[in-house]
Each structure stands twice: as C-alpha cells, then as structure tokens.
C-alpha cells in the first residue's frame, strides 16, 4: 500500500483539522481515565507526589509544587539531544524507542552532530564544561550524535546506557502524527502537554529492520509509557548516571563532581530538564515537554541546578 504524499498545504490543513477536534480528543481522554486500572491511576499519582509535582488528572497536566527541589546528583550534567532525523521531519512521526532506518540521522543531522562536537569542544576550552564521561542512549541517532566528539576526543570515557532511551510511545511509535485519527487522544500529548495519556498497545518490533538489536535483549515488543512514567524512568537513569560516574571518574575528579555529557532525546531530555528544575512552564504554570518546549537538535545544554550564571 502506497504511503500518503503530504504537501505542505495538505499537512497544514490536516493539523488544523486535528486541532479543531480537541473537544472530541478530551472525551476520548476521559474514557481512557475511566478504563484505566485503579492501580495505574494510583501509580501515576504516586510518581507525581514523589517528584513534588502537582498532577491534574482531569486534564493530564503537571506543575511544580512549591516544595519541589531539583534532583540532587553527585554529577554535573550537560544534555545533548540527537541531531535531526527523518522521523522528526514533517510529516513527523511519534519517534520514541524505535531504531529503524527513518529514525537515523539525516545528512543535516550528521552536520548538526559535528557542530555539537565543535560546540562542546569550545565549551571545554573555555572551561565552561569539560566532560569527564560521555553517556548515550542506545538508540543510534543518539550514539551517532555523540560519535564526532568521541572520535576527536578519546580521553573522556564513552559508554551506552540503555536507561537513557527515549520515551516509549507503544503502538503510536513511528506512526505519522497526521495519519492518526483526528479525534485520537494521542494528539493531546503535543497539543495540550498531557502527561498521562499513553497508547493502549505496545510497539511490535520488526527485528529484521531494527538497527541496534543488541540492546533489545530478545524483546519482541515495547510497551507504551506516558510522560509521568518517562519522568520516573529518567529519575532512575540519572541516579545510575551518578553511580557510573562515581565508579569510573570519582578517583580522578577528587573533591569536585564528575561532569557528564549525556546524549539523548527530546522527551527524555525534557524529563531530565524537569527533574533538575529546568522545566519550561506556560502562562498558567503548567509544564510543557513537546512541541515548542523541546530542546533544539544537537545543542549542548548545561543542566546544573543553582549554578552561577
């Protein structure tokens, strides 16, 4: 079956049509909540409570509570989202924990990766951020974004950490946003920054086309997670980053914190930003994580809470 060819005009019209269906999407979200298992609702509320976030289940949005404090880590973090891929080029897809051909760096993405390496080298030369350790998501778009810096700078250790993988969109993964039903509550994820909505079914892996099978460890499918669950997973990932850095770099760093450059993704990066107190808020104080709120491609971003400007 031939793929739909989207002209810019047709795509713009489709997105406007989707936006006009927010009331129907909200009705679908209300059904999603009614059908959710009670233990899932409790778990999502517990995640928010543990992270000192205010969760409005009715609209799926989150805010910082007054008592929120950034996650305390024994490391300093510089986060680099991967370079551009076909998957985040219009007509874009939900690009989560997938690693197929369309999820790899484009030529522009490769150029961005090289530019990110140059930028990080300049930051090191200026003593703004000198990495002791480089950690990457196992998805190749992140690994290949790290590669130019790794190749030119052999001194910092480089490791792949599976826990840094992107948010898993389940059955939405690698589906074109424009081709989901216009009343699908999936659209609330990016239209209204809904941190609760998630796909019902998993992503079924096509092993023959998967580009990095070694980290799958035999998995045949990847369950969906919502942004709250991604936050919780990235919290655990950051704690592990601290443990790895202490083990590998602690003796050479002395009294100072090890500095870690993390190569990752848009939603995972947004989660890390929220956890470290750099979450982006709208006019009502709700946290955003997709669309206009995401990190730019291949741009080193220092995320050190309470750091002096």
Swiss-Prot record:
Q: Which GO terms describe its cellular component?
A: cytosol
Activity regulation (record text): By diethyl pyrocarbonate (DEPC).
Catalytic activity entry:
D-mannitol 1-phosphate + H2O = D-mannitol + phosphate
Its Enzyme Commission number(s) read 3.1.3.22
* Keyword list, A-Z: Hydrolase
Q: Which GO terms describe its molecular function?
A: fructose-2,6-bisphosphate 2-phosphatase activity; mannitol-1-phosphatase activity
Organism of derivation: Eimeria tenella
Q: Does the keyword Hydrolase apply?
A: yes
Any one Gene Ontology BP term: regulation of pentose-phosphate shunt
**What family classification does the UniProt entry report for this protein?**
Belongs to the phosphoglycerate mutase family.
| Biological classification of the source | Eukaryota, Sar, Alveolata, Apicomplexa, Conoidasida
**Function text:** Key enzyme for mannitol biosynthesis.
Q: Where is the active site?
A: 82, 166
Pfam families noted in UniProt: His_Phos_1 (PF00300)
Q: Which pairs of positions does the record mark as disulfide bonds?
A: none
Name of protein: Mannitol-1-phosphatase
């Amino acid at each position: 079956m031939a793929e739909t060819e989207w002209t810019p005009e047709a795509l713009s019209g489709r997105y406007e049509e989707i936006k006009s269906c927010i009331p129907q999407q909200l009705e679908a979200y209300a059904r999603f909540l009614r059908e959710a298992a009670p233990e899932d609702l409790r778990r999502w509320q517990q995640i928010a409570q543990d992270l000192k976030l205010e969760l409005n289940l009715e609209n799926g949005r989150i805010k910082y509570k007054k008592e929120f404090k950034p996650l305390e880590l024994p490391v300093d973090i510089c986060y680099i989202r991967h370079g551009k891929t076909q998957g985040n080029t219009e007509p874009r897809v939900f690009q989560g924990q997938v690693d197929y051909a369309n999820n790899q760096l484009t030529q522009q993405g490769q150029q961005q990766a090289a530019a990110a390496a140059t930028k990080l080298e300049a930051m090191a030369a200026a003593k703004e951020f000198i990495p002791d350790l480089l950690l990457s998501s196992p998805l190749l778009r992140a690994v290949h974004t790290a590669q130019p810096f790794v190749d030119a700078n052999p001194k910092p250790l480089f490791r792949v950490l599976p826990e840094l993988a992107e948010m898993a969109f389940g059955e939405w993964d690698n589906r074109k946003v424009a081709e989901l039903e216009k009343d699908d509550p999936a659209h609330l994820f990016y239209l209204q920054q809904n941190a609760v909505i998630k796909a019902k079914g998993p992503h079924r892996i096509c092993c023959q086309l998967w580009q990095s099978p070694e980290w799958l460890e035999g998995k045949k499918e990847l369950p969906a997670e919502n942004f709250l669950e991604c936050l919780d997973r990235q919290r655990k990932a950051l704690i592990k980053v601290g443990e790895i850095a202490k083990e590998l770099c602690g003796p050479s760093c002395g009294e100072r914190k090890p500095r870690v450059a993390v190569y990752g993704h848009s939603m995972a990066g947004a989660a890390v930003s929220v956890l470290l107190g750099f979450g982006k808020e709208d006019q009502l104080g709700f946290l955003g994580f997709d669309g206009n709120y995401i990190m730019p491609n291949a741009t080193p971003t220092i995320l050190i809470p309470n750091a002096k400007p």
